[in-house]
Curated annotation (Swiss-Prot):
Keyword set, alphabetical order: ATP-binding, Ligase, Nucleotide-binding, Protein biosynthesis
Protein task: Allows the formation of correctly charged Gln-tRNA(Gln) through the transamidation of misacylated Glu-tRNA(Gln) in organisms which lack glutaminyl-tRNA synthetase. The reaction takes place in the presence of glutamine and ATP through an activated gamma-phospho-Glu-tRNA(Gln).
Classification via InterPro entries: Amidase, Amidase_CS, Amidase_dom, AS_sf, GatA
Cross-referenced SUPFAM superfamilies: Amidase signature (AS) enzymes
Protein name in the entry: Glutamyl-tRNA(Gln) amidotransferase subunit A
Organism ancestry: Bacteria, Fusobacteriati, Fusobacteriota, Fusobacteriia, Fusobacteriales
Gene Ontology CC: glutamyl-tRNA(Gln) amidotransferase complex
Length: 487
């Protein structure tokens, strides 16, 4: 490829040009801010930018290079982070009115790791409020548009993160994935979205939605860029007891590998009525390409898939209602003005501070945890979650990876008024990976009506390497999508 603009380069290419003295960090960062200035009014990926600070950090990095000091693994790479990942001194709102003026008092572990490796954080991206949604329309700040069609949603909840990469405003964005919030927007926006195994990346500093499901993920233009970022953000953390102590491999060693003999499973339950036939064609084309690369493809069964959506929408709201109890108008965040006593302070603050979707999920969560319904809903959902997990364990003993669609439809219009149930059903193909705690990656597989469509690979827990290997092989076989110019 011939690049006329720096923003078209991948993170790997930018880093190489920085390390070889071909480009300065200041030039790189400036070029991305120029791109943001040009397209941000159309897309609205960001809720805040840190231009002065980022340029200052870039100049310091140039000085570091000039002095011959050791440079980090992400030196010179601009990165964006989702608005629910804390950064010291930076406004972090989770795109909610209740936190509209909250300033982070410490760095999330992933942010700390990025900074230690000389990445430059250029801005904070838009999202659905408290990561609850699949459109980025529930954000308190504004709606984000899909760079492929400005009248369509970018997906959610990490819609701003996906749109920022697709609009080439940044080469890598960090998001969070509780039920598909990295992979679905990656599919809608034609970029790569990676959700690691639960416990592979620290959640310290991630605003909690559903603590047993949340995982920080990465969005980028290429699988290689995902591998480079994962090398930095994965691994043990003293501040998060759920992080595995398993050694983190060098994910870049699994790029450019032969996948001959790999066994891929296609779950029959994922190719159902309601799946756009043209999306099935995209998956079929990927299957054909994988067979040409020497992989073996077999049909498999994940029998409890039909229970995944109801299970998720009992467990996730239950955890959310508990996690969001801390936003009460007393400790921090928004506080209602007209109240008469403590109870009215709580009620008014939470009624005014939370949006409709968040309130809906708090109510669902409170209901399923209440004394009369705990056994009927929450306890039963936990049992079904175990069955879903067992389905994955059984199947992943027979095959190396599972291949599925990411979403049953292409990006829908911003003007579409889908019911909450219709939106919840959009998560059918992504939430099982969170319920089972397995890693998953969404890779652009092709176009349907000039809109991008992703394919999803899921693998064994803590075997991110095989997903990097197979997604990279498929990406190189079918080629990358040409991202929209937005001129």
């Amino acid at each position: 490829m011939v690049y006329n603009n720096l923003y078209e380069l991948t993170a790997k290419e930018l880093r190489d040009k920085f390390l070889s003295n071909e480009l300065s960090a200041e030039e790189i960062v400036n070029s991305f801010y120029e791109r943001i200035e040009k397209v941000e009014d159309k897309i609205k990926s960001f809720v805040s930018l840190r231009k002065d600070k980022a340029l200052d950090e870039a100049r310091k990095l140039d000085e570091k290079r000039k002095n011959g000091e050791k440079l980090g693994r992400l030196a010179g790479i601009p990165i964006a982070i989702k608005d629910n990942i804390l950064m010291e001194g930076q406004k972090s709102t989770s795109c909610s009115k209740i936190l509209e003026n909250y300033i982070g008092i410490y760095d999330a572990t992933v942010v700390k790791k990025l900074k230690e490796e000389d990445a430059i954080i250029i801005g904070i991206t838009n999202m659905d409020e408290f990561a609850m949604g699949s459109t980025t329309k529930t954000s308190f700040h504004h709606k984000t548009s899909n760079p492929w069609d400005l009248n369509r949603v970018p997906g959610g909840s990490s819609g701003g993160a996906a749109a920022s990469v697709a609009a080439q405003e940044v080469p890598i964005s960090l998001g969070s994935d509780t039920g598909g919030s990295v992979r679905q927007p990656a599919s809608f926006c034609g970029v790569v979205g990676f959700k690691p195994t639960y416990g592979r990346v620290s959640r310290y500093g991630l605003m909690a939605f559903a603590s047993s499901l949340d995982q920080i993920g990465t969005l980028a233009k290429t699988v290689e860029d995902i591998a480079i970022c994962m090398n930095v953000i994965a691994g043990v953390d003293d501040y998060d007891a759920t992080v595995s102590k398993k050694e983190v491999p060098d994910y870049t060693e699994f790029l450019n590998k032969d996948i001959k003999g790999l066994k891929i499973g296609l779950p029959k339950e994922y190719f159902i009525e309601g799946l756009n036939p043209e999306i099935k064609n995209v998956v079929d084309n990927s299957v054909k390409a994988l067979k040409e690369l020497g992989a073996e493809v077999v049909e498999i069964s994940l029998p409890h898939t039909k229970y995944a959506v109801p299970t998720y929408y009992v467990l996730a709201p239950a955890e959310a209602s508990s996690n969001l109890a801390r936003f009460d108008g007393i400790r921090y965040g928004y506080r209602a003005k007209d109240y008469t006593d403590l109870e009215s302070l709580y009620v008014k603050t939470r009624s005014e501070g939370f949006g409709a979707e968040v309130k809906r999920r708090i109510m669902i969560g409170t209901y399923v945890l209440s004394a009369g319904f705990y056994d009927a809903y929450f306890k039963k959902a936990q049992k079904v979650r175990t069955l879903i997990k067992q389905d994955f364990e059984n199947v992943l003993n027979e095959v190396d990876v599972i291949l599925t669609p990411v979403a049953p439809s292409v990006a829908f219009k911003l003007s579409d008024t889908k019911t909450p149930i219709e939106l919840y059903l959009e998560d059918i193909f992504t939430i099982s990976a969170n319920l089972a705690g397995v890693p998953a990656i969404s890779l652009p597989g092709g176009l349907v009506d000039n809109l991008p469509v992703g394919v999803q690979f899921m693998g064994k827990p803590f075997d991110e390497e095989i997903l990097i290997k197979i997604a990279d092989a498929l990406e190189k076989k079918i080629g990358r999508l040409n991202l929209p110019k937005l001129d």
